[in-house]
C-alpha cells in the first residue's frame, strides 16, 4: 500500500465558534435611512460638478471610497459626456490627461495612447519637468497600467514614472503621499481589490485638507453596513461547512473557509450579490479539498477512479471509490444539483450539464498533473501552462461566477463561455502564475508537480531569479490582454468586472507569498479589516 503523503497544513484560526460570534450594530432602518439621505447629498454634488477635472476627481474618489456602485448611472452619464465632448486634453496638464485616460479606459472607452504625446520631447522621451510633481508621476504611473500589448508610449510611461518614483519615495516629506507612492509601486490601483482599497483610502482621504465630510460619512457608514452583510454570509457558510462534516472527514486537506470567503468577496464584492458569494465560497472550499486529494493524499490508481467518477457524474458508481473520495464527490455533486435546481426553478434553464463539464475538465487537469508528478516528468513551460491555467480552477470559478450573478442567463453567452474565450483564459492565467510565484517553493518541498518556475528553469537552465522574472513578464502580458478585453465589444460585457476581479484577488493573495494555503499576517489583516473591524463613527 502506497504511503499517504501529508501537506502538514497549518490549522485555520477562523473556527466556527469565532465566526458565529461576529456581530455588527450597523443594521436596521435607522442606518438605511441615514445612508439614503447621504446618497441624495452626493448626487447633488455630482450634479453641481461642472468642471471636467472636478468631475473626474469626484468619480475617482467615489470609486476608491468603495461607494461608486450607488451612483453607476450618474458616473456612466458623466463619463459619456466627457468622452463625447469637444474638450481637448489639456496639453500641459498631465494629471488631468492621465486621470481622464485611466477612468475612461476602465469604463470601456478606447482612448488612444497618443494623448500622452504632447508631454514628450522630439526624441520621444517624457519632458524633464514631469518629474517635478510626485502626484503627477503617480497619476501617470497609474494610467500606464491600463495598457494593451503594443502600446509603446504607455510602456515608456510606466518605466519612466516607476524609475523616478522609486528614486523619490524615500525623500518624500509628506507621510500620506509617501505611503501612497509605496502602495502604488507595490501594486497599481487598477489591479487592487476594491474593498481593501476602500478600507485604506477612506482613512487617507479623510486626512486631506479638501476632503468632503459627506463622502467620508457615507463611505464609513456604507462600509460598516456592508460588513454586517458579509458577516451574515460568512456565518451561513460556516454553518454549512460544519454540517457537511468535511473538516473532520478530510483532516489531511487545507481547511480555509474564511480565506475562501475573502476570495469570493474580492471576486464578487457588490453587496447585492450575497447569494453568489455564498455559492462561490462553498465551491472554493470544495475545490481546495479536491486539489489536496489530487496533489497530496490520493494514490494514483484512486485518482484515476476519482477522475472517471467526474466524467460519469453518476452516484451509482460511488462504491468504486474509497470513502474519503465518496464524501468529497457527493458534496460536489449535491452542491451542483442544488444550484442547478435553483436556476431551473427560477429561470427554466438546465445548467447541470455545464457544471458537469466544468468539474470533469478540472479533474482531468488535476489527474494529468498527478501523473506527471508520480512519473517524475517535468513538462516544458508551454506544456505545463496549457494544463495549469485550467487546473488552477479559474474556468470553473468564472463559470460559477457567471451563473450565479446573471439573470436571465443567456444560452448564447453560456455556450461562448464554455469555449474559454480570452475573458476566461487570461484571468485564469494570472491566477495560475501568481499562485506559482507565491507557492512553488513550498509545494516542491512538500512534493508536488513542478510549477512554471521549475519548468522554465529545467527548460532553459536559468536560475530561479531569472525564472521568476520570466513568470512576472507572463503575468504582465496576461494583464494587458485582460485590459484589451474591457475595451472590446462582446456578448458578455457585464461579466468583465468579475473576471478582472479574479485577477485582482489572485494578485492580492499571493503578493507576499502563499496567502491562502499558509495564511500570513496580510491575509489575516485583510480578513479582520473587511469582516471584523468597523470604522468608528461618532
Swiss-Prot record:
Binds 3 Mg(2+) or Mn(2+) ions per subunit. Keywords: Lyase, Magnesium, Manganese, Metal-binding. Catalyzes a mixture of sesquiterpenoids from (2E,6E)-farnesyl diphosphate. Catalyzes the formation of exo-alpha-bergamotene, as well as (E)-nerolidol, (Z)-alpha-bisabolene, (E)-beta-farnesene and beta-sesquiphellandrene. Also has activity towards geranyl diphosphate, but to a much lesser extent. Optimum pH is 8.0. Belongs to the terpene synthase family. It catalyses: (2E,6E)-farnesyl diphosphate = (1S,5S,6R)-alpha-bergamotene + diphosphate. The keyword Magnesium applies. InterPro entries: Isoprenoid_synthase_dom_sf, Terpene_cyclase-like_1_C, Terpene_cyclase_plant_C1, Terpene_synth_N, Terpene_synth_N_sf, Terpene_synthase-like, Terpene_synthase_metal-bd, Terpenoid_cyclase/PrenylTrfase. Its EC number is 4.2.3.81. Mg(2+) 1 binds at residues 291, 295. GO terms for biological process: diterpenoid biosynthetic process; terpene biosynthetic process. This is Exo-alpha-bergamotene synthase. A motif (DDXXD motif) lies at residues 291-295. Mg(2+) 3 binds at residues 435, 439, 443. One of its GO terms (molecular function) is magnesium ion binding. It comes from Lavandula angustifolia (Lavender). Mg(2+) 2 binds at residues 291, 295. Its cofactor is Mg(2+); Mn(2+).
Amino acid at each position: 500500500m502506497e504511503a499517504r503523503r501529508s501537506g502538514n497544513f497549518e490549522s485555520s484560526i477562523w473556527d466556527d465558534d469565532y465566526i458565529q460570534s461576529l456581530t455588527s450594530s450597523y443594521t436596521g432602518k435607522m442606518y438605511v435611512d441615514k445612508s439614503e439621505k447621504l446618497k441624495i447629498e452626493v448626487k447633488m454634488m455630482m450634479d453641481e460638478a461642472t468642471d471636467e477635472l472636478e468631475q473626474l476627481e469626484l468619480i475617482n474618489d467615489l470609486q476608491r471610497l468603495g461607494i461608486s456602485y450607488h451612483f453607476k448611472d450618474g458616473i456612466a452619464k458623466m463619463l459619456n459626456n466627457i468622452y463625447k465632448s469637444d474638450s481637448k486634453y489639456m496639453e500641459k496638464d498631465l494629471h488631468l490627461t492621465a486621470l481622464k485616460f485611466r477612468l475612461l479606459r476602465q469604463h470601456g472607452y478606447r482612448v488612444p495612447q497618443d494623448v500622452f504625446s504632447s508631454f514628450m520631447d522630439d526624441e520621444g522621451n517624457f519632458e524633464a519637468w514631469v518629474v517635478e510633481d510626485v502626484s503627477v508621476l503617480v497619476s501617470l504611473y497609474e494610467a500606464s497600467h491600463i495598457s494593451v500589448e503594443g502600446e509603446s508610449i504607455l510602456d515608456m510611461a510606466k518605466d519612466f514614472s516607476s524609475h523616478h518614483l522609486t528614486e523619490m519615495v524615500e525623500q518624500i516629506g509628506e507621510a500620506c503621499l509617501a505611503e501612497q507612492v509605496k502602495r502604488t509601486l507595490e501594486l497599481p490601483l487598477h489591479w487592487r481589490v476594491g474593498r481593501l482599497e476602500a478600507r485604506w483610502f477612506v482613512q487617507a482621504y479623510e486626512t486631506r485638507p479638501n476632503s468632503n465630510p459627506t463622502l467620508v460619512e457615507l463611505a464609513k457608514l456604507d462600509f460598516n453596513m456592508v460588513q454586517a452583510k458579509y458577516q451574515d454570509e460568512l456565518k451561513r457558510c460556516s454553518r454549512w461547512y460544519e454540517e457537511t462534516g468535511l473538516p473532520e472527514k478530510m483532516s489531511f486537506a487545507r481547511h480555509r473557509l474564511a480565506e475562501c470567503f475573502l476570495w469570493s468577496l474580492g471576486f464578487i464584492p457588490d453587496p447585492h450579490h450575497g447569494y453568489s458569494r455564498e455559492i462561490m465560497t462553498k465551491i472554493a472550499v470544495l475545490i481546495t479539498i479536491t486539489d489536496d486529494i489530487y496533489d497530496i493524499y490520493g494514490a494514483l490508481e484512486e485518482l484515476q477512479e476519482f477522475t472517471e467518477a467526474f466524467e460519469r457524474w453518476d452516484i451509482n458508481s460511488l462504491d468504486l471509490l474509497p470513502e474519503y473520495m465518496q464524501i468529497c464527490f457527493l458534496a460536489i455533486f449535491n452542491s451542483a444539483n442544488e444550484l442547478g435546481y435553483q436556476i431551473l426553478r427560477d429561470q427554466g434553464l438546465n445548467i447541470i450539464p455545464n457544471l458537469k463539464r466544468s468539474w470533469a475538465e478540472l479533474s482531468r487537469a488535476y489527474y494529468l498533473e498527478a501523473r506527471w508528478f508520480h512519473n517524475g516528468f517535468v513538462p516544458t513551460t508551454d506544456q505545463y501552462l496549457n494544463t495549469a491555467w485550467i487546473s488552477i480552477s479559474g474556468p470553473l470559478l468564472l463559470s460559477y461566477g457567471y451563473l450565479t450573478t446573471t439573470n436571465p442567463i443567456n444560452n448564447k453567452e453560456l455556450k461562448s463561455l464554455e469555449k474559454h474565450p480570452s475573458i476566461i483564459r487570461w484571468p485564469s492565467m494570472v491566477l495560475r502564475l501568481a499562485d506559482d510565484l507565491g507557492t512553488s517553493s513550498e509545494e516542491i518541498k512538500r512534493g508536488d508537480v513542478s510549477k512554471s518556475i521549475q519548468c522554465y528553469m529545467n527548460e532553459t537552465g536559468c536560475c530561479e531569479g531569472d525564472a521568476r522574472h520570466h513568470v512576472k513578464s507572463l503575468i504582465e502580458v496576461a494583464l494587458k490582454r485582460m485590459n484589451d478585453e474591457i475595451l472590446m465589444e462582446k456578448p458578455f460585457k457585464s461579466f468583465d468586472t468579475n473576471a478582472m476581479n479574479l485577477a485582482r484577488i489572485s494578485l492580492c493573495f499571493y503578493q507576499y507569498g502563499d496567502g491562502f494555503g499558509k495564511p500570513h499576517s496580510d491575509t489575516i489583516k485583510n480578513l479582520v479589516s473587511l469582516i471584523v473591524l468597523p470604522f468608528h463613527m461618532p
